[in-house]
Amino acid sequence: MAHKKGVGSSRNGRDSDGQRLGCKKFGGEAVKAGNIIYRQHGTKIHPGNNVGLGKDYTLFALIEGVVKFERMGRDRKKVSVYPAN
């Protein structure tokens, strides 16, 4: 007979770090060209005026200006950058 108790191993105990998705610049905030506005998987938010779409669906400013979130119809959203006056 074993004189030490068998120790079971847990199959849990793993949790990956979050991917830091979401809004990086909010409506009304000033941005420079190249600033990341929104990180996402898929087009949760679409690119509007003066906003580029990266290959990983990151939205970024193409010009210096102010961020504005807008609606495209009833169920879609877009983000645009307009020059600050």
UniProtKB/Swiss-Prot annotation:
Cellular component GO terms, alphabetical: cytosolic large ribosomal subunit
GO biological process, alphabetically ordered: translation
InterPro entries xref list: Ribosomal_bL27
Region (Disordered): 1-21
Highest taxon of source: Bacteria
Keywords for the protein's UniProt record, in alphabetical order: Ribonucleoprotein, Ribosomal protein
GO terms, molecular function: structural constituent of ribosome
Listed Pfam families: Ribosomal_L27
Database matches in HAMAP family: Ribosomal_bL27
Name by which UniProt lists this protein: Large ribosomal subunit protein bL27
Source organism: Geobacter sp. (strain M21)
